[in-house]
Each structure stands twice: as C-alpha cells, then as structure tokens.
C-alpha cells in the first residue's frame, strides 16, 4: 500500500489517498491513542471514490473514532469497464427504455462484478490491518449489498454489517444470504424506484443472522433520512467498540 496524498481536514480527520497495485482508495482516520476499529465502505454503479455523498459519510464516520476505507472497484471512478460490462449496460439501457424485463441483464454483469471485487477488498483489508493505527474489529458499511453478502460469508474478520437495499442482488448472493450470521442492519427505502420492495423484504427474511434489524423509511432511492446515520453509528458502536 502506497499513500499518494494526505490532507488534514478542519474536523481533525486525516484523509489519505492510496494505491494498492492497480487499486486506488481513500482512507479516513483521526488521531487516537489506540488502534481504531475499521469500517469498509464499498460503492459501485460506476461511482468514483470522490463522490460527495460517499466522502461525507467517510469523514463523518471517521470523526466518530473509526478508520474508514473505500476503493474504486473495476468500472468505478477512473478504472475502465470491461467490454462485456459495457455491452451489458448498453443492453440494460435499451431494455429499460423499451419496458422489457431486466433481471437477466443485471445478473449478467452484477455477478461478475462481485466475483472480481471481493478478492480486491480482501487484499485491501490485509493491507489496512497492517497499519499501526488500525486494529479492528472490522465492519461493513457499504451500499453495495451483493458484495457485502459475499464478504460477510467469506471474510471472518468482518463482525457486523450495514446494508442498503438499493441495488440488484444476484441469485448467488441471495442464496448466500442464508449463510450470513453476523449482526446486521438493513436499510430499505419503501418507494425505491429501482428496487422492488418485496424482493428486499425476502432478502431480509433470508439472512441467517440471529441479530438483524430492518429500518424502512418512506421515499425513493435517495430519500434515506439523515437520522439513519445516527442509528447506524450506534449499531457499529455496539459491535466494533
């Protein structure tokens, strides 16, 4: 892991850009006398790690005593998409304009994205936990639920997860959800135009966790109330501090 820039922000948060091989990422930390617990904050849908909403979440969470990391997966930020990914997305746009079913198209490119991103996140986690200022435990706090399910099942260092029911979850991850046993907070926007409500409720029901909490709020995809950040903070404090 090589740090390429750093900036001390007004709230005392240190924001550092890093590269790990071909993986670009951002790490937010604050000065602490002891190593900080770590929150992984993945994103997808082509968003860059510099997306303002993601950066605001990272800084806010770090200011409350966590180390927070995000990376650009393939196809996000400046990382190129594969030809197959570009073709699938073009077909998705065509099908949506025509009002045709899109599940199989989502399946064709979201599944491979998860398969490719999970090893990169494990590599990133290995490198982050070697830093003296980070000691764990580790939580998942990303909007990319499909990736979170895969990591919650395959990465024992992750001990709690917060998911947002706002994107397509491939069949493989819907099956894997039954193997998720860590404490779970699941956010659902009741009127999310891109995520069928019943499918999200079925996914919540499938999770095998004995401690799982569903927070449902009225509104569309971008309408999550600000107070959910406070509730999420209490959830992570219980399990990571």
Where are these regions (language model features)?
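Primarily recognizes the serine-hydrolase "nucleophile elbow" in alpha/beta-hydrolase
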Residues: 115-179
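N-terminal cap/lid segment of alpha/beta-hydrolase-fold proteins
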Residues: 1-37
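Catalytic active-site module of serine/aspartate enzymes centered on a nucleophile-bearing elbow/loop
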Residues: 218-219, 224-241
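Serine-hydrolase catalytic machinery in alpha/beta-hydrolase-like enzymes
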Residues: 38-133
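Acidic catalytic loop of the alpha/beta-hydrolase fold
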Residues: 190-195, 222-223
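Conserved alpha/beta-hydrolase "acid-adjacent" motif
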Residues: 172, 193-199
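Catalytic histidine neighborhood in serine/cysteine hydrolases
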Residues: 201, 205-223
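Short beta-strand/loop motif that positions the catalytic acidic residue
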Residues: 180, 186-188
């Amino acid at each position: 892991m090589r740090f390429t820039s750093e900036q001390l922000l007004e709230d005392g948060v240190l924001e550092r850009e890093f590269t790990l091989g071909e993986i670009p990422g951002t790490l937010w930390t604050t000065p602490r006398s002891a190593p900080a617990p770590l929150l992984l904050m993945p994103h997808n849908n082509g968003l860059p790690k510099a997306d303002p909403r993601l950066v605001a979440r990272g800084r806010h969470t770090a200011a409350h005593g966590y180390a927070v990391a995000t990376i650009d997966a393939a196809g996000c930020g400046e990382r190129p998409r594969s030809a197959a990914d570009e073709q699938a997305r073009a077909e998705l746009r065509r099908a949506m304009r025509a009002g045709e079913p899109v599940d199989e198209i989502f399946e064709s490119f979201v599944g491979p994205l998860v398969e490719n991103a999970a090893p990169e996140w494990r590599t990133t986690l290995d490198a982050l936990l070697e830093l003296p200022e980070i000691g764990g435990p580790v939580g998942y706090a990303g909007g990319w639920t499909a990736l979170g399910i895969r990591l919650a099942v395959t990465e024992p260092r992750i001990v709690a997860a917060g998911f947002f029911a706002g994107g397509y979850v491939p069949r493989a991850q819907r099956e894997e959800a039954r193997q998720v046993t860590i404490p779970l907070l699941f956010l659902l926007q009741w009127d999310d135009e891109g995520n069928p409500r019943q499918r999200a409720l079925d996914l919540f029901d499938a999770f095998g966790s004995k401690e799982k909490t569903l927070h449902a709020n009225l509104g569309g995809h971008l309408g999550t109330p600000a107070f959910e950040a406070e509730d999420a903070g209490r959830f992570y404090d219980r399990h990571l501090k």
